[in-house]
Amino acid sequence: MRKPVIAGNWKLFKTKNEALALIEELAPLVSGVDSVEIVVAPVFTVLPTLPAALAGTGISLAAQDVFWEEEGAFTGEVSPRMLLDAGASHVIIGHSERRQYFGETEETVNKKVKAALKGALVPIVCIGETLEAREAGDTFKVLERQLKGGLEGLTGTQFAPVIVAYEPVWAIGTGKVASDDQAQEAHAFIRGVIAGLFGKSAADKVRILYGGSVKPDNVKGLMSRPDIDGALVGGASLKGASFASIVRYSE
């Protein structure tokens, strides 16, 4: 049985005090939820201030990106060791906004995934097609390329902790949502690619999250599908009540 993951990507929102206020609001609302793994991903500057606030809440801490070198002359970058030091246990890698605005490629995703795993962080590896790719009928081709490129060179044992997030780029921050059927079709395909890469057992165990305008009113339908194991939530994770409602989707 795959334990669902609900991860909140705060993107470029929330100062230290705003983040602490959000955790203060969120923590009691998700208290006692043991059936779901809860993760929040603040900006780098906020990471070190949250572990104390999250203690005893069952909420894990993720970074929104990582660099593949441990240290060196890489201005502006943060290494896996430094993220661990700041209290993170997870890291989002290859988010569509990183690909769109900052030149992220399959090659850099692959380096980051390997570095994160070596540094004992759980990678949340994001893949997804643009509207152009979907309309051209290239969804599966894009997903397979991104998956194989991002996970290249990993053994089945190394892959085991990895979480995959499917985020159709056309549904991020647009208010458009992939239908439950569209999302399930993509997730089933992703699981099939993983089976080809690492075997059926690995594919059966990997958690595949859906990301793309997830809200309290659509999460239940998405989570009812057999290959959807959670959500990577953007805007709706910035308010305690809406994020808690998503976390408690099964109630």
UniProtKB/Swiss-Prot annotation:
<dbReference type="GO" id="GO:0046166">
    <property type="term" value="P:glyceraldehyde-3-phosphate biosynthetic process"/>
</dbReference>
<dbReference type="GO" id="GO:0004807">
    <property type="term" value="F:triose-phosphate isomerase activity"/>
</dbReference>
<comment type="subunit">
    <text>Homodimer.</text>
</comment>
<dbReference type="InterPro" id="IPR020861">
    <property type="entry name" value="Triosephosphate_isomerase_AS"/>
</dbReference>
<dbReference type="Pfam" id="PF00121">
    <property type="entry name" value="TIM"/>
</dbReference>
<dbReference type="InterPro" id="IPR013785">
    <property type="entry name" value="Aldolase_TIM"/>
</dbReference>
<feature type="binding site">
    <location>
        <position position="173"/>
    </location>
    <ligand>
        <name>substrate</name>
    </ligand>
</feature>
<keyword id="KW-0312">Gluconeogenesis</keyword>
<comment type="pathway">
    <text>Carbohydrate degradation; glycolysis; D-glyceraldehyde 3-phosphate from glycerone phosphate: step 1/1.</text>
</comment>
<feature type="active site" description="Electrophile">
    <location>
        <position position="95"/>
    </location>
</feature>
<dbReference type="InterPro" id="IPR022896">
    <property type="entry name" value="TrioseP_Isoase_bac/euk"/>
</dbReference>
<dbReference type="GO" id="GO:0006094">
    <property type="term" value="P:gluconeogenesis"/>
</dbReference>
<dbReference type="GO" id="GO:0006096">
    <property type="term" value="P:glycolytic process"/>
</dbReference>
<keyword id="KW-0963">Cytoplasm</keyword>
<feature type="binding site">
    <location>
        <position position="213"/>
    </location>
    <ligand>
        <name>substrate</name>
    </ligand>
</feature>
<comment type="pathway">
    <text>Carbohydrate biosynthesis; gluconeogenesis.</text>
</comment>
<dbReference type="InterPro" id="IPR000652">
    <property type="entry name" value="Triosephosphate_isomerase"/>
</dbReference>
<feature type="binding site">
    <location>
        <begin position="234"/>
        <end position="235"/>
    </location>
    <ligand>
        <name>substrate</name>
    </ligand>
</feature>
<comment type="function">
    <text>Involved in the gluconeogenesis. Catalyzes stereospecifically the conversion of dihydroxyacetone phosphate (DHAP) to D-glyceraldehyde-3-phosphate (G3P).</text>
</comment>
<dbReference type="GO" id="GO:0005829">
    <property type="term" value="C:cytosol"/>
</dbReference>
<keyword id="KW-0324">Glycolysis</keyword>
<feature type="binding site">
    <location>
        <begin position="9"/>
        <end position="11"/>
    </location>
    <ligand>
        <name>substrate</name>
    </ligand>
</feature>
<keyword id="KW-0413">Isomerase</keyword>
<dbReference type="InterPro" id="IPR035990">
    <property type="entry name" value="TIM_sf"/>
</dbReference>
<comment type="similarity">
    <text>Belongs to the triosephosphate isomerase family.</text>
</comment>
<protein>
    <recommendedName>
        <fullName>Triosephosphate isomerase</fullName>
        <ecNumber>5.3.1.1</ecNumber>
    </recommendedName>
</protein>
<feature type="active site" description="Proton acceptor">
    <location>
        <position position="167"/>
    </location>
</feature>
<dbReference type="GO" id="GO:0019563">
    <property type="term" value="P:glycerol catabolic process"/>
</dbReference>
